[in-house]
Swiss-Prot record:
Gene designation: ybjL
Organism for this UniProt entry: Salmonella typhi
GO molecular function, one term: monoatomic cation transmembrane transporter activity
NCBIfam families membership: PRK04972.1, YidE_YbjL_dupl
Biological processes, Gene Ontology terms: potassium ion transport
InterPro entries, per the entry: AAE_transporter (IPR050144), RCK_C (IPR006037), RCK_C_sf (IPR036721), Transp_YbjL_put (IPR023017), YidE_YbjL (IPR006512)
Keyword Transport applies: yes
Positions of transmembrane segments: 8-28, 32-52, 66-86, 94-114, 158-178, 383-403, 406-426, 447-467, 475-495, 540-560
Keywords (A to Z) from UniProt: Cell membrane, Membrane, Repeat, Transmembrane, Transmembrane helix, Transport
Primary localization: membrane
Ranges where the RCK C-terminal domain occurs: 200-288, 292-373
Pfam short name (any one): Asp-Al_Ex
Listed name of the protein: Putative transport protein YbjL
Length: 561
């Protein structure tokens, strides 16, 4: 039995799609030195190669892929988008505007200089910025621009071609820039990180090990009674002195949860909760030969929960003002926009921040009710909310505007992005609404992106050989310029106009480029996760601005003559 693989793939779009995805994901695991190719590049390369052999895919699959991707980007950005935009993000907003705006203007200038069409120019901008949202926004606006079908087909092919030719250039150049640009300026990144840490009281030990609190029980002897000197628990401030707090007391066989007015007496049995190192540092009067093992006394359910900041009495307050330890709770992590932040008493809490807190289940529940809610650990996605907001996004995208003889629509990309932001924002404020497990969100986002990249490559593959010969050298130059010059402009603006701390500035620059690999290099250079504060500040805004840049470049292009 003979099987013609080419005919088999051409006759089955679904089979072709998953063959491209599987081969591309395998290729993406390869490394060039310390740089991994990545899934996007792997799928793009494989799809380009198969596209050269005249394999093609249904455009509906491509459209669905980018719709899912851009919607999920909005859902991720939603919890912090409005707080950054309206309150704390003036510097971060300005940095993102400078980065995206300068890249847009440079791309427009180079496109006119080299005589390219809008497809090549927008594709070059998207690839150089390693930004799929630019590609998505430009492609969607082109489809709704009302230009002739033959011109539209050529522009969309060139859009994919420009992106394919410059993506790797943009990625590698930014990674190299992230490694060497900090060394070209006069301030050491590690020193800058330490400086901001001292100013804000940050915990600079980013690699500290996080332990869960444990419970141990001790019998009160004469030494401990003498140590307390008749003071009640509130006056003693045991947590401040030992790092542990008294959760339970057994007195005369009666088990009770003490309040601040309780005074320790001879023969009491007390249950102390604290980190292992805090137990090890206890004064000998607590533990020398007096530890007890009592099932009832030690029967406590220590839990670790992720608490989402929501309530108005917590939003805008500093972490220290929550006084978690006074309520018998221990803070393990602070997460903002999927980025782990330094545990900093002076960090101002934003709506949607996630605090990982450990302690007795009842105490954790109490503190969660006070500052927000416990993140739902269900693995069930609220598909109704997902579908409803997806529909809303598509309806927003149908809105069109007419200017003289030129019409353009908001487009599916911008509409879905806005709808996703609203879903993410509402989810951060309403615990029972719109829940999407992070794993499910990542899977849908990644799958949508990979489907889109496969469609882009198969569409552009047939013309890539001619494109390389005609504009390959120009694309190389333009890709480097658009990738690096906006970074330099952004650095100069942040350093000398905004006068930002360099560790925060470099983190914010990488956030404005939405490039996680480059962010890791900056953190390694600073030997701190302080730059993550800046990265989180610009990342959500930049995702939105980059999508709008893809739309704007198509709208502006006809007016340049």
């Amino acid at each position: 039995m003979n099987i013609n693989v080419a005919d088999l793939l051409n006759g089955n779009y679904i089979l072709l799609l998953f063959v491209v995805l599987a081969l591309g994901l395998c290729l993406g695991k390869l490394r060039l030195g310390s740089v991994q190719l990545g899934n996007s590049i792997g799928v793009l390369v494989v799809s380009l190669l198969l596209g050269q052999q005249h394999f093609s895919i249904n455009t509906d699959a491509l459209n669905l892929g980018f719709m899912l991707f851009i919607f999920c980007v909005g859902v991720e950005a939603g919890p912090n988008f409005f707080s950054i935009f309206f309150r704390d993000g003036k510097n971060y907003l300005m940095l993102a505007l400078v980065m995206v705006g300068s890249a847009l203007l440079i791309a427009l200038g180079l496109g006119k200089l080299f005589g390219w069409d809008i497809g090549l120019t927008a594709g070059m901008l998207a690839g150089s910025m390693t930004s799929t949202p630019v590609l998505v926004g430009a492609g969607d606006t082109l489809r709704h621009s009302g230009i002739a079908s033959t011109q539209l087909s050529s522009a969309l092919d060139n859009l994919s071609l420009g992106y394919a030719l410059t993506y790797l250039i943009g990625l590698v150049s930014l990674i190299v820039g992230a490694r060497y640009l900090p060394k070209l300026q006069h301030q050491d990144l590690q020193t800058s990180a330490q400086q901001i840490a001292r100013e804000r009281g940050l915990d600079t030990d980013a690699n500290r090990k996080v332990y869960l609190p444990v419970i141990r029980a001790y019998r009160v002897g004469p030494e401990l009674v003498a140590w307390t000197d008749g003071k009640n628990l509130r006056e003693l401030g045991i947590y401040r002195q030992t790092g542990c707090y008294i959760e339970r007391i057994r007195r005369n066989g009666i088990l009770a949860n003490p309040d601040g007015d309780a005074v320790l007496q001879m023969g009491d049995e007390i249950a102390l909760v604290g980190y292992p190192d805090a137990h090890a540092r206890l004064d000998p009067s607590f533990r020398n030969g007096k530890e007890v093992f009592d099932r009832d006394l030690l029967d406590m359910r220590i839990v670790t929960e992720e608490i989402v900041v929501k309530n108005h009495n917590a939003v805008g307050r500093r972490l220290a003002q929550l006084k978690l330890t006074d309520h018998g709770c221990f803070l393990n992590r602070v997460i903002r926009s999927q980025i782990e932040m330094p545990i900093d008493d002076n960090v101002v809490l934003n709506k949607g921040d996630v605090l990982q807190v450990s302690g007795d289940a009842r105490r954790v529940k109490t503190i969660a009710d006070r500052i927000g809610f416990i993140s739902i650990h269900s693995q069930v996605t609220d598909l109704l909310a997902f579908c409803a907001f997806f529909i809303i996004g598509l309806m927003i995208g149908m809105i069109t505007f007419q200017f003289r003889n030129f019409s353009f629509g908001i487009g599916n990309a911008a509409g879905l992005l806005f709808a996703g932001i609203m879903l993410g924002f509402l989810r951060a404020n309403h615990p029972t609404f719109g829940y999407i497990p992070q794993g499910a969100l990542n899977m849908v986002k990644e799958f949508g992106l990979m489907v889109f990249m496969a469609g882009v490559g198969l569409s552009a593959g047939s013309g890539i050989s001619n494109g390389l010969g005609a504009v390959g050298g120009q694309m190389l130059i333009a890709g480097l310029v658009v990738s690096l010059i906006p970074v330099v402009i952004c650095f100069l603006f942040g350093a000398y106009v905004l006068r930002m701390n360099r560790a925060l500035l470099f983190g914010a620059m990488m956030g404005a480029r939405t490039c996680a690999p480059a962010m890791e290099i900056i953190s390694d250079t600073a030997r701190s996760n302080i730059p993550a504060l800046g990265y989180a500040g610009t990342y959500a805004i930049a995702n939105v601005l980059l999508t709008l840049a893809g739309t704007l470049i198509v709208i502006i292009w006809p007016g340049l003559g």
